[in-house]
């Protein structure tokens, strides 16, 4: 049951006050001051999220009680930890990121289960498996700069995260710090499952994420996010095409890179190298004609039937009308239900 003082603080925090009331709010414990915040604590009447100062911290509706509690624990702000716990924040999340013995004891005194053994890894996996915005954000906040992960097998953790994210999070296992790896992991999971609130949150809270956001957009075939990322990220079109070809059926990503000037013959060969034949046929529809090189590569990969087909002089090229500019709306309309035309040509040839 909530205490009378807790209920009173909640009632006060749901209202907006003028600056002349700020000294009273500070005395009342409804003030948050740190390196980035300095303002009154408010509760949104509609979603029960926490806001600080004149404007929300994140997106349109502030931050959840759990996120506020996690941040207060990391800042070792004991009064706010107690306040947010009394208001309904999950103190177990706080215990997972408590960075001092005194803060750990406070969390346990407020009802947290002492974290032990695999609980940290199990929680990390749970947050990424539930596939909703709030859990991805909670996972990011709990494990960002969390020293407990210094004790885990880093190579095993990096491999596991890369497999779950589906997209390569790093070039080599030793080339990226764990903090950056985890940031990329949460972002990739959000993009992969189109969790727009989490994407917006990470865009605003993870520094220098834009280059990786472009890689995600290319890999997961999202022309709108590609278009947005290209406004701030300068990447060579052929490098972009290489990323796009790493996932099959990435027609919209490949077409966007093609319009930027990427080499479509190289895209055809890269698609075959990765074993993504739908991408290869799409490149042929766009005008790729590296049939001799592709035939040699198919032979090396022991694809004898494909090698023979690529040697036939039956293919039509430039079957897709080019857009004047890489407009994601036009690209999506043009390719959403695209049928590979030269695959039909092959079937027609053999059915004659």
From Swiss-Prot:
Keywords assigned: Early protein
Q: Which domain of life is it from?
A: Viruses
Task: Cite the InterPro entries for this sequence.
Answer: ASFV_MGF360
Induction (free text): Expressed in the early phase of the viral replicative cycle.
The GO annotation for biological process reads: taxis
What family does the Swiss-Prot or TrEMBL record give for this protein? Belongs to the asfivirus MGF 360 family.
Q: What does this protein do?
A: Plays a role in virus cell tropism, and may be required for efficient virus replication in macrophages.
Name of this chain's protein: Protein MGF 360-16R
